Amino acid sequence: MRHWYDQAIIYQIYPKSFQDSNSDGIGDLNGIRKRIPYLKELGINAVWLNPIFVSPQVDNGYDVSNYFAIDPKMGTMEDMDNLIKEMHEAGIHVIMDFVLNHTSDQHPWFQDAIKNPESIYRDYYIFAGENNQRPNNWGSFFGGSVWEKDPAGTGQFYFHLFDKRMPDLNWKNPEVRHAMTEIAKYWLEKGIDGLRLDTFIHIAKADLRQNFPVNSKDEEPVIAEPFFANLPQVQKWMRPFCEEIKQDYPDALLLGEAASANVNLAVDYTNKDNHLMDSVITFRYFTEDQSKIDPSFLNNYQPKPLDWVKFKQNQTIWQQTLSGISKPTLYWNNHDMARLATRIAKNDTQARSLAMLMYLQCGIPIIYYGEELGMRNLQFENVNDFQDDTVKEFVKSAEKAGVTSKEALLMASKTHKLPARGPMPWDNERNNGFTDKEPWIKGKKLDETNAADEIADDSSMFNFYKKLISLKKEQLFQDGNYYLWSTSDGSYVYERNLKDKKALIAVSLSQEPIEIEVGKEFSSERLSAGEYDLTAGKLRLEPYAGVVLEN
């Protein structure tokens, strides 16, 4: 059975940064509605909205305090109903971000749990320890311990894998599993077309009474990922959740965020026989070259180039292993990482070539808002703008090593996730048409691009992406087989074939011209970036150029 998402081309919208409609400096649902014609012009057929539920905004909406209502800063339920209706009228499906692993500490469940130790909601969360002693040495992804003292003064602690104001739900409790299923079904009944299942791989935890091995106490608390990521119970608990949704909404896309999952886990999570997800988003594609790191200070925000050899290996493993099982997601950037034009691409030509390379593989493209304009990260000039203590630690460490704070902030601006969430530039007016007030996010814009100019320029990045998306919709690039050519480290060449149709995607990863023997079979250009020459079966690519050739 074919589903709409088998041909999905998804555009990720970070609502706070897309379009402000009511002059408060924050993007909102009515702003997104205003830009539906733009999305239709680009050619995408689905949008993924980052969280829009009621939230204290400790983690930009990933801390939900009410799953059944729209955050007032985003708009109203009527606005959401209209957005769904108007997106559908434009032929665009709507995917919502659904946070399953944790809630806000302001959620009524948690508030009741800490006010009354006998509350039924106490078991909706993970409380452990006694006599003010933490149960183990596990560390939070946001720094410090995963354990925070129970505000009720019981001597216990509650578990939070992320910020201390985002307590983890206890998925061992069948009432929690039922409640989260009902929330998902509520939104699907409203007409949305799918859910991105945020951090679902963390819903199961190992025995809390064990410490993670460390060499010294100085290493504690420690990120004990084997104890809280991809455990077998994840599949056990997610299966009824997914089955119940698919029973009532068989055409709903279930897109799982499985950041640390390897390809074998991806097979488990998306194999139709397992009745789980339709596809997963992994962070395993992007192996970085660690050889350029300065060991004299913390490396978490030092820029690191992509290891292209490993990247080719990773892509091919995922393409080949998932073939016939599910479609992998194809992306270069999202709200949790620096932008393509900042992190990887050396120039406009390479950004275009890499887009061809990624999105014409077998899989579901996810294009991050503004990527189609060549948007870059903002530059933050104050450490507090990052809203992240780990950046403060990085800057202090760099200064001790003789790096100026200005240089350290520049590094962090190129690598941190928050500068990748800058306002969408629509035109040449104040704040590029995003808002007529001060935007919610501070930072210096480093590129001159805007949507109005890009649309008007036939040779622009926007119009390149428009052609690329149109090409991706063809059956060859949807259903064709994938075959990686054996070429030098300085190039990435693969073939898509379906019956008698073939396409060759050839991209230079080198700052020097390269030559590739492609034979005379591939002679017709479909799309290109940069300069190339094809003569007598020999393809010459100028630095970072790329081309799509067909037979």
Predicted segments, located by residue:
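Basic/polar N-terminal segments that are highly enriched at the extreme N-terminus
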Residues: 1-2, 551
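Hydrophobic residues within beta-strands of alpha/beta enzymes
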Residues: 47, 195-197
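Loop/helix patches that line or flank the sugar-binding groove of alpha-linked glycan CAZymes
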Residues: 5-6, 216-218, 223-226, 236-238, ...
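C-terminal beta-strand-rich structural cap/linker in extracellular carbohydrate-active enzymes
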Residues: 535-551
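Beta-strand-rich binding/interaction modules
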Residues: 513-529
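Acidic/aromatic-lined carbohydrate-recognition and catalytic surfaces
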Residues: 2-185, 189, 202-262, 272, ...
